[in-house]
């Protein structure tokens, strides 16, 4: 009897610990141009349906009048119509046209947000979400330009928290999983300039320089996503359980039916939610800096270096590549959960 009581206690304790360790995720995205943002958001909703993470909210870092409506349509499509959304109002953030955001205007996709004016400013929402969470519990996934992250770092105390941005991050955030830069030779180019960096160099420089050293940053470079092409066969066959599927339509509008789009943003999602499952390897700890032209440089600390090693970047073996891509396909194509 004693054995069974101990076993049951251990079982329930393990359940409690598993629940307590469920990652709390804020998704910061530049959803406008490339469609990998749409697939990454689908992954997060499906992971939340599985209980693998808790999705706290979505903030948008590029300017387009349809961003909030589209994200609300996708959140509603995935059964979370009230998920908080914030948009940048930084005039220096990149403006971008989109091939797929107008799907939010389709009657096939219900939602109630029709204007960016109806949602909070992104940094205000970030501060609100962070302040409401337990200390050291939030993982931020940033896939796009770093406007919102840089402005969070610059933010003063407010009604949500008296802490300025760096102190609030230090208190509440346990990981920044960021898709940006390049950390390998890419197509014989040793000085590759990646889009998320060069489309907002000052903001990415601010993040690389000023992000608190106590909070780890894991970078997914261009070379990771380009090694993980989302198979067009999945788009053709795995989304037909509904007559109208927002993710499939966005993919086809962006790149057509004959293209395997790299999983850049999805790689940062997969690592942030499952850092212990070894879908990826990690570099040694060091520091990332961003040059004036947008080149990301990773350096290992020297023995006399007073600057703590805060940054790592993802690596990928052939075996990990197969596992990671399979996971991404399943987690993207999973039918949405509806009550």
Residue ranges and their predicted role:
Residues 5-16:
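Bacterial N-terminal signal peptides
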């Amino acid at each position: 009897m004693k054995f069974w009581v101990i076993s049951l206690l251990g079982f329930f304790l393990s359940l409690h610990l598993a629940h307590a360790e469920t990652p709390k995720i804020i998704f910061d995205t530049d959803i406008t141009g490339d469609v990998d943002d749409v697939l990454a958001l689908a992954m997060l909703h499906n992971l939340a349906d599985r209980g693998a993470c808790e999705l706290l909210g979505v903030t948008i870092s590029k300017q387009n009048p349809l961003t909030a409506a589209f994200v609300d349509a996708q959140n509603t499509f995935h059964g979370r119509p009230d998920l908080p959304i914030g948009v940048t109002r930084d005039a220096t953030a990149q403006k971008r046209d989109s091939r797929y955001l107008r799907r939010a205007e389709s009657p096939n996709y219900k939602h109630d947000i029709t204007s960016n004016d109806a949602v909070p400013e992104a940094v205000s929402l970030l501060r609100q979400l962070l302040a409401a969470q337990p200390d050291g519990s939030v993982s931020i996934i940033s896939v796009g330009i770093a406007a919102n992250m840089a402005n969070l770092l610059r933010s003063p105390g407010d009604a949500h928290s008296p802490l300025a941005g760096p102190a609030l991050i230090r208190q509440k955030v346990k990981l920044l999983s960021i898709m940006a830069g390049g950390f390998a030779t890419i197509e014989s180019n040793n000085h590759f300039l990646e889009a998320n960096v060069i489309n907002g160099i000052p903001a990415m420089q601010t993040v690389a320089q000023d992000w608190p050293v106590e909070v780890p940053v894991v970078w997914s470079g261009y070379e990771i996503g380009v090694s993980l092409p989302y198979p067009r066969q999945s788009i053709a066959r795995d989304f037909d359980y509904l007559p109208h599927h927002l993710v499939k339509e966005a993919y086809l509008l962006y790149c057509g039916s004959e293209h395997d789009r790299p999983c850049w943003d999805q790689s940062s999602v997969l690592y942030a939610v499952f850092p212990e499952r070894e879908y990826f390897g990690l570099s040694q700890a060091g520091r990332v800096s961003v040059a004036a032209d947008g080149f990301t440089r990773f350096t290992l600390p020297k023995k006399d270096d007073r600057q703590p090693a805060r940054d790592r970047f993802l690596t990928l073996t052939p075996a990990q590549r197969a596992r990671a891509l399979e996971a991404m396909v399943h987690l993207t194509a999973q039918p949405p959960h509806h009550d």
